[in-house]
Amino acid sequence: MTLDEVLAYIHKVDWRGSVPGLSRIDTLLGLLGHPERHVKYVHVTGTNGKGSTCAMLASVLRAAGYKTGLYTSPYIFRFNERMQINGAPIPDDTLCALVEELRPLADRMADPPTEFELVTAIGLTWFAREACDIVVCEVGMGGEFDATNVIPAPEAAVLTNIGLDHTKVLGNTVEAIAATKAGIIKPDCHAVLYPCAPSVQEVVAVRCRAAGAPLTVADFDALSSVCDTLEGQIFNYGPYKDLRMPLLGGHQLRNAAVALTTIDVLRQRGWHIDESAVRQGLAQTAWPGRFQVVRRQPTIILDGGHNPQCMVSLAAAIREYLPGQPVTVLTGVLADKDYGKMYDQLAPLAARFITVTPHNPRALDAGELAAFLRRYGKPVTACDTIREGVSRMLADTPPDGTAVCCGSLYLLGNVVQSLEKV
């Protein structure tokens, strides 16, 4: 199979969407001899910040000398980004060979796997065959019934910031969502939690007690900023002083605190991670599309924020780094998101909106989004293509101005490709 054939098979239209449950992926991995059982893991869930936290953890573990796998979703530029070892995406020929091996197994299953389950099986098989020392594994959605939860008890089960998202599947209260996400906590693991409301923390604590798993909550009182510019951040966390990190925004400092708390937990469990690895790993963390400056004159920032909590963080970052500047907002969103509350956060900072349709079946049409955004009294232009939207954004933004591209991770790769062509 060629790479195009492999990707067409993975994304083929007759795969079902998200179907919670572990039976299908467990069956598929069983046909392969359960490779996932031969690897150590850090399992990360949460509503926001889980990808950034995964990237920090993987970078630190790699700097400590461990052969480190990283499994995340979605991708921004190429599908292969979703599974990496020591920062390198899965090679095309390896991906093709694995799909050729898994395809007949998946096709003959009476209850075939979903796309996410198939991709997860590919990643877990690759990590095991490459003899990774440890894999940082991001949950796709939820936790307890997510395909990634087929893995054995992880070294650490990490819960980042929890909020309302995917409510039709996970529940319509933060406590209900937390209960689902806490399903990744198993006996013989150590849980790490982003500080949250007492009612939410108690939900996680109940799960920990049932599993006999210790719980450590990150200490944001021990976190302080030293220097913060568009070039990066310097901060302190507990005994760590003057740590450097390229990821921007106060929310990333909080994600870093969760990552550092997890590193301390791993040390307690026998992993050798010295301070120099922590410093090097954080400084080298790369995670595109999170308040990422990709061009100057004008300043163009990419942010994959796709729910109200994300937009609170994005708005705070704009106020911090670009105080008083009028901002051109190029945006597109998925129709099932709470985009009203999202744009309530962003509208006061926008000089104008340019709407596009992300390349995703769940996307809201650019014209519909434009009609909605006109309620904020700002100029709004709907564009037929992302490339047209990028051209309009550049035309409408002065050289000393700023444009922010946001609303969906599914938008950003096409924005970058368009920027390279205009």
What does each of the following model-derived ranges do?
Residues 194-207, 211-216, 230-234, 299-302, ...:
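C-terminal helical cap/extension that packs against the catalytic core
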